[in-house]
């Protein structure tokens, strides 16, 4: 099944994507991100991450560099938004 999903993404990237104007606001592109996520985490987790990325790929989000995470999580982790609590003296 993994090969079928990866071949489908390849087909999209080679035959469909070039016929449409570039729209992805992220690096790597959503198709590259999904391909890498499927390779790294398997079909279901990879497609889940790809879907989560795809729904964020719109003008309401900033975009930019957004690599496949090192570890899989069902929850969204915002990078660089970790808060450190200070002790009050």
UniProtKB/Swiss-Prot annotation:
Cystine connections: none
Domain of life: Bacteria
Tagged with keyword RNA-binding: no
GO cellular component: plasma membrane
Main location: membrane
SMART domains, A to Z: Haemolytic
Pfam families assigned to the protein according to its UniProt record, in alphabetical order: YidD
Membrane topology listed for this record: Peripheral membrane protein
Subcellular location: Cell inner membrane
Keywords for this protein: Cell inner membrane, Cell membrane, Membrane
HAMAP family in the cross-refs: UPF0161_YidD
Function according to Swiss-Prot or TrEMBL: Could be involved in insertion of integral membrane proteins into the membrane.
Similarity remark: Belongs to the UPF0161 family.
Name used for this protein in its record: Putative membrane protein insertion efficiency factor
